Amino acid sequence: GTVGGGTPILDYAKNSLRGERIVSFQGILNGTTNYILTNMANGMTFKAALVDAKKMGYVEADESLDIDGFDAAAKLVILANWIMDMKVTIKDIKRIGIRNVTTSDIKKASSNNSAVKLIASCNKDLLVSPQQIHLDDPLCVNGTLNAITFNSEHSGQQTIIGRGAGGMETASSILRDLLDIRQEMARR
């Protein structure tokens, strides 16, 4: 549940795509970095956007977990192992965070009708990196939202979007996990 905060990514893959072979997925798995990048697109510097995210309570105690892509990479490992039945660790992820994204990068993306987003992807390779995403792409969400697109063998692309960063979102996902554990224990 804590993969995606208030967005039930694992539940969706487990239940809604049951019987479907997921061949790849990509998405925004860290609401904090999405919030920072959204604020940068609205004219803030990276530093000011980070300070604002801290004031809102979105940033991990160790900010490098968010801005250097460690949080997104850890979630990518969980998803790859759970959904794709891979056997990967954090060491298998190529990771580039948002620390070096500049206002110039943001403006360049905007001039291409795109936005810079920290995207975690599981194709042949596992990658977390800032990428230009076209404004019409369903992954181009703003604020603390998370989004993930599953590419499945028969159903094609399916995207789910929901709240990512924040105390209530995390609490919701933990409660969902606890209820799942309780249900599983009741079956035994």
Regions found by a protein language model. Name each.
Residues G1-T2, A13, I28, T32, ...:
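Fold-independent oxyanion-binding glycine-rich loops
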Residues T2-V59, F70-D71, I78:
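Rossmann-like NAD(P)H-binding beta-loop-alpha module
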Residues G4, P8, E20, M44-A48, ...:
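Conserved active-site and cofactor/substrate-binding residues in soluble primary-metabolism enzymes
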Residues G19-F25, K124, L145-N146, H154-Q157:
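Short coil/turn connectors at secondary-structure junctions
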Residues V23, E60-I67, I160-A165:
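A short glycine-threonine-serine/GTX helix/turn-capping micro-motif
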Residues N39, L50-A147:
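Substrate-binding/catalytic subdomain of NAD(P)-dependent oxidoreductase enzymes
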Residues N42-F46, I83-I90, D180-A186:
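Short helix-capping/linker segments at secondary-structure and domain boundaries
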Residues D136-R188:
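ATP-dependent carboxylate/acyl-activation modules
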